[in-house]
Amino acid sequence: MRKTKMTLLCVLLGLFQGMVLPSCETNRGELIPYLEFDIYLLLYADLADLGIGGTKLIDGGVNGIVIYRESDLEFHAYDRTCTMWPEHDAAVTEDPTFFGVFECPVCGSTYLLMNGGEPNSGPARYPLVEYSTSLNGDVLRIFN
């Protein structure tokens, strides 16, 4: 009888750890508020000066959006909110010495846009939030 109670206690403790401890991890998606928006940009007007590997800052999202042009027809759009401390409400800014590297002015985390917005250095563990993009003819749509 005593062995059965001990086994039951171990099983319940294991289930408790399996359910509660992973929930202590903060989900990146919960850090940055979800906003619904649609932004339309003309490829040959609004983005004419955006070469491959280049970036352009636009209004939108939580703290602004940075557009990264990966190839002729492939674009990525990232929210400029640092995923380490989004409550600081400070937008990441482009590192003047490296193309496609953005740095948080609060925590010093750097993000590589050519690597999916992944953190490169600093305390941030999650990539910048990426918004959906689609190119239809000469119109780039950024949406969430």
Task: List PLM regions with ranges.
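Extracellular secreted precursors and ectodomains with disulfide-bonded cysteine-rich loops/domains
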Residues: 22, 80, 102-105
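Sec-dependent bacterial lipoprotein signal peptides
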Residues: 1-24
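N-terminal pre-ligand scaffold of iron-sulfur
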Residues: 25-97, 112-113, 129-144
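Short cysteine/histidine-rich metal-coordination sites, predominantly Zn2+-binding motifs
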Residues: 96-106, 118-131
